[in-house]
A protein has these predicted regions:
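Enrichment for repetitive, rod-forming helical segments
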Residues: 10, 22-23, 131
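Intrinsically disordered, low-complexity Ser/Thr/Pro-rich tracts
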Residues: 12-17, 346
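Gram-negative and organellar
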Residues: 32-427
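Bacterial N-terminal signal peptides
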Residues: 17-28
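N-terminal secretory signal peptides that target proteins for export/translocation
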Residues: 1-14
């Protein structure tokens, strides 16, 4: 496991000693009304392609989750503790995939004070909304409600680096003020600043809102402006219209500056596209009780010129136990393009066992390794064993630009525990 991550979790040189926090707060757990726990173990055999060489490796992953709710402490409402963590072992060294490592994704305590006027969250958490986008943070987050309609939130702490993310800085703080004039409507103004050492890594302001214009018409919009760069980092607007009970149409537009999603201190921002704009719309139509259709088209404006993106999906319920689907996605920009087609089917043998299969083919405009596409088929079986246990076995076989033949095998077993039936339901 990464030593920096372990040090941060255990409090060795850390400003947020999460492990110490957990040990202090664990005492009230015995009085908790509801405890939910999950454990998932996965084994995966798959190939790895690196510098023209192919080798097979085995990855073992363990994911655990714990939710402790309704902890009874005088003066505190909705007190709960949440934990989500994972660990992984790999048979390959220097793998291009995630190797032998692990981390804590979430570990926080949360509660409400003063008749729910103040809510506090302390520990490793996800801060979302407004200029924060989605920020994983070791710190504190609070929301103060002045009335049912108006409130402010503020947070501060150390941003963390998790799977599939990059370091964004060493200290972050920000907040959001919001107004909820009616059910389904909310507008907000927000701010975020991230510091890396003594250098400014990000400084953004944001506005966002959703509005129920009519009972069947709603609109959402958001925008984030980089103060340092004096440019819009991200903006979007979407209009939804429920024309009929079974028909919804929508239109949307967006502007993205990918380089502003990276820290201002990152050298990779030089290589990122400057702008990406899109506009289009689509629909979802439940044609019959057995068939549904989703269509979407976007016109693209990118640095190199114009492009098009389209998505079509249909789901058909063949019988009470069988369902099939067809999907197609097309993306074309001036210098590249991809066409992706997928078909899948799912069938329930009984209440506990479900079988599924799919085949996916991709056609590339520009060949990779002298190969113009890929095709991969997958078959899987899931089994709800009972008493909280479940299992899955899945295998894939196909050819990709990186492998003449690619085969993967995945096995998973999971366990879920909850005392909600005994305590939560009775209460």
């Amino acid at each position: 496991m990464n030593r920096e991550i372990v040090g941060r979790i255990a409090g060795v040189g850390s400003r947020w000693p999460a492990l110490a926090l957990l040990s202090i707060l664990w005492a009230p757990v015995a009085a908790a009304q509801v405890v939910d726990a999950t454990s998932t173990t996965m084994l995966r055999l798959k190939p790895e392609w690196q510098a023209g060489d192919t080798r097979n490796g085995v990855w073992g992953t363990e994911l655990v989750g714990l939710s402790v709710r309704n902890i009874e402490v005088a003066g505190v409402d909705d007190l709960n503790i949440q934990l989500s963590a994972w660990g992984q072992l790999s048979s390959l060294k220097d793998s291009i995939y995630t190797g032998s490592t692990g981390d804590i994704d979430l570990l926080y305590i949360q509660g409400a004070l003063f008749n729910h006027h103040l809510s506090l969250t302390l520990g490793r958490q996800l801060v979302s909304g407004g200029a924060a986008r989605v920020l994983q943070l070791d710190g504190v987050n609070g929301t103060l409600m002045f009335s049912r309609a108006f409130g402010v939130s503020a947070y501060a702490g150390a941003p963390t680096t998790s799977r599939f993310t990059y370091p964004v800085g060493e200290f972050a703080f920000g907040g959001r003020a919001f107004w909820r004039p009616s059910y389904g409507s909310e507008v907000g103004v927000s701010f975020l600043e991230i510091i890396s050492g003594s250098v400014l890594s990000r400084q953004d302001v944001g506005v966002d809102g959703r509005w129920a214009v009519l009972p069947n018409v709603s609109a959402t919009a958001s925008g984030i402006f980089s103060i340092q760069e004096e440019r819009v980092a991200d903006a979007s607007v979407t209009l939804n219209w429920q024309v009929l009970k079974d028909l919804e149409i929508f239109g949307k537009g967006a502007h993205t500056s990918p380089d502003l999603f990276l820290p201002l201190t990152s050298i990779f921002s030089v290589f990122a596209d400057t702008n990406r704009d899109s506009a289009g719309g689509g629909l979802f139509w439940q044609i019959t009780r057995q068939a549904g259709l989703y269509l979407e088209y976007q016109r693209l404006w990118v640095d190199g010129g114009n492009g098009d993106e389209a998505d079509a999906r249909t789901t058909i319920k063949l019988t009470r136990k069988s369902t099939m689907g067809l999907e197609a996605r097309f993306l074309f920009v001036p210098t590249n393009g991809v066409t992706d087609l997928r078909a899948w089917v799912s069938h329930s043998l009984n209440e506990k066992i479900r079988l599924s299969a799919d085949v996916e083919g991709t056609v590339l405009k520009n060949p990779v390794n002298a190969t113009g596409g890929s095709i991969v088929g997958t078959a899987s079986a899931t089994w709800a064993i009972g008493s909280g246990w479940n299992a899955m076995l899945s295998g894939s076989l196909g050819a990709t630009p990186f492998f003449q033949t690619a085969a993967t095998l995945t096995a998973r077993i999971g366990y879920t525990f909850s005392n909600w039936q005994q305590k939560g339901a009775a209460k």
